């Protein structure tokens, strides 16, 4: 993205976002299968689902920034809301997503906590 190749960045980030989402869902499913049967497997799978979801959210946030750079706020806003919903407003990435929504004028009141 630093080199300005936004089309390539969009494609790579969309692909990463989709792949990490699939991986997270697979680990969630695996965790559910072993819930109540084998706690270590269930917990390990849940932890891996969370790790993949974090990477998905990182990719989603970066994709939103690419859309901002291309002056496409209508594409950025839904992505930022998805990140905020997943991360919550109290986590670092959630705060960054909300700050972007304020900068875009989608939200009026900055979150200062």
Regions found by a protein language model. Give the residues of each.
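Residue-level signature for tetratricopeptide repeat
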Residues: 2-3, 66, 104
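Alpha-helical adaptor scaffolds
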Residues: 6-73
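Boundary/linker segments of alpha-helical solenoid repeat arrays
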Residues: 21-32, 87-97, 106-112
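Solenoid-like repeat scaffolds
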Residues: 49-51, 85-88
């Amino acid at each position: 993205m630093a080199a300005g190749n936004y089309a390539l960045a969009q494609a790579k980030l969309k692909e990463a976002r989709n792949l990490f989402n699939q991986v997270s869902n697979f680990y969630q499913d695996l965790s559910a299968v072993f819930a109540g049967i084998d706690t270590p497997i269930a917990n390990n799978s849940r932890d891996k689902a969370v790790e993949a979801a974090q990477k998905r959210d990182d990719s989603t946030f970066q994709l939103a920034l690419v859309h901002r750079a291309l002056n496409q706020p209508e594409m950025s806003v839904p992505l930022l809301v998805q990140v905020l919903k997943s991360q919550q407003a109290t986590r670092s990435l959630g705060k960054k997503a909300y700050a972007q929504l304020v900068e875009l004028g989608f939200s009026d009141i900055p979150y200062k906590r």
